Amino acid sequence: MTENFQIPEDLKVMLDALRRVGRPRLVGGGVRDWLLGLVPKDFDIEVAGTDFESMIRTLSPFGVTDVVGRSFGVLKVRSKATQAEYDFSLPRKESKTGAGHRGFIITPDPTLNDHEAAARRDFTLNAISYDPFSAALIDPFNGQADLRAGILRHTSAAFVEDPLRVLRAMQLAARFNFSLAHETALLCKSIASTYKELPVERVWGEWNKWAIKSKVPSKGLTVLEQTGWLVHFPEIANLRGTQ
């Protein structure tokens, strides 16, 4: 992808304002989708170098602000100009404190650099960010190479701290025809016993994405088989070998 990220005009105005108080970056799935040649449906912006109250004050003139997570630095803004909704957040650190998907303490830290902020992402291809002012991609984990190769690879060993990421790998593989890196599959296999720690609604959320958005559904099931997680879904496991 060589063309610049097509940012909505109302969001550009917000980014210009944020530039005066911090360092905004586009992050997450929107950047990934753009690099895949798709039109991003969501715009997530991470703002370093500022505090949460300054971010709220800066964005309030542009729409209705909804503080959805003050303790972990997340703000939604519904644009006055278009009624589009954008997510803004501070960079944050995660500390594992208990079992399962929710056993974390999340701490906003606007002093984190791009590499440190990206380290909490699940896969390298989701850890790419975009500087809207220089049009530069920030890619500390070589996610662009994995994206071109269609490989889901973990950013760090902390991947195993959230077992939901295995099911996220399942639905991403199915949606984008991705394959799972061998070393990532081994990590997933090492936490297969933690499946029961996951909330039912979060498990359903990942399966729902698989069911609705899959391009190659079998790729997701292959991920489950590679990782030893297929055993948790016996009804599907029993279909192996059928046509």
What spans do the regions from the language model cover?
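Catalytic cores of the polymerase beta-like nucleotidyltransferase superfamily
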Residues: M1-Q243
